[in-house]
Regions:
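Acidic, mature catalytic/reactive cores of soluble proteins
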Residues: 1-328
């Protein structure tokens, strides 16, 4: 199976996911985003659990300020714990909430508490229920290209997918608590989620019906980027159905290609869709217009969630575009 080329086993029996060939290592964010697709989707739940066991050990070491024994890079990035909870949410859907709670409930609780207690060095939970991150001088999101030591896309402050992930994590954690009869914990999490939901809409939704990419004080980034697809695709979203449809429509019109979603709309300033030339030139194009295939999974999920079977043939046609790449 093509997925197996990314599975890595070390001598001590630790299991990892390689971020890519030829030079990418095992990176925390990439691990949690890709793990469900590289394991659960091909019915390899056991390998999911083995990778998660290694990754959990690494994240506990990070939370406790201990030296890392797990060979996972970028574990300090602020969205890593949020993607970890998302990955476990996919495991719960594949198995059951009860099974997920039994194996990973304590880890999920510890991660949520770690964030709520503001113990992460670059993830601050504000009174409005949103997460704030400093990304001015160092790239902190998946759009992490740098040039001359500075992020090409300096996303900072309230970052749209971080807060969509946070709302989703709170609601998922509440649903796990409900599945095992912990009503007190469930209600506490839902109350927190409600605060986050209102602030998310007030902060990110703009007058044109799409979402700001990030907001930092009076600075609102109007760039049309694919990060707004995440709150449409997640199981728990702070957006209403009508709001989701408007966001999806803009993603379809301005970002969708046969091979993925553009990292920036052609109508936005700085659009650069051609990834060629010397390293610096490529760094400036990396997240400024080039299309990314992995985002299509979330786009397709958003389409099916909103339009059900009426979008099935459309999604199938989108997937056909990847066949040549997969059989190259």
């Amino acid at each position: 199976n093509a997925a197996h080329q990314f599975h890595r086993r070390e001598k001590n029996d630790d299991r990892y996911i390689l971020a890519g060939y030829p030079w990418f290592k095992c990176r925390a964010r990439d691990t949690f985003i890709s793990l469900p697709g590289l394991t659960l989707s091909i019915e390899e739940n056991d390998y999911f659990e083995l990778v998660m066991k290694t990754a959990m050990r690494g994240y506990y070491e990070f939370m406790e300020g201990k030296p890392l024994t797990a060979h996972i890079t970028e574990i300090e990035q602020p969205d890593v714990p949020l993607w970890a909870v998302w990955a476990l949410q996919q495991y719960a859907k594949e198995t059951s909430k009860e099974e997920c709670h039994k194996k990973y409930g304590q880890f999920i609780k510890d991660v949520i508490r770690f964030i709520q207690d503001n113990k992460h060095p670059n993830l601050e939970l504000k009174e409005n229920g949103l997460l704030y991150t400093n990304g001015r001088d160092k790239a902190v999101t998946w759009m992490n290209s740098t040039a001359n030591g500075r992020p090409v896309v300096p996303r900072t402050g309230y970052i749209v997918e971080f807060n969509a992930l946070w709302y989703n994590a709170l609601c998922f954690c509440a649903s796990l608590a409900g599945a095992v009869g912990d009503e007190a914990d469930q209600q506490k999490l839902l109350a927190q989620a409600e605060i986050t939901k209102k602030s998310f809409v007030d902060t990110f939704l703009n007058e044109y019906g799409y979402l700001y990419d990030y907001v930092d004080g009076n600075m609102m980034d109007w760039s049309v980027r694919p990060n707004m697809i995440f709150p449409v695709a997640f199981d728990y979203s702070p957006l209403s159905q009508d709001q989701k449809k408007k966001v999806l429509d803009i993603c379809t019109r301005e970002l969708l290609t046969p091979k993925g979603l553009r990292s920036l709309s052609p109508k936005s300033g700085g659009y650069n869709p051609i990834y060629v030339g010397p390293q610096t030139q490529r760094d400036y194009a990396y997240h400024q217009g080039t299309a990314w295939p992995w985002l299509c999974g979330f786009y397709m999920e958003a389409s099916l969630k909103l339009y059900k079977r009426t979008r099935l043939s459309f999604v199938e046609r989108q997937m056909v575009g990847f066949e040549d790449e997969m059989s190259y």
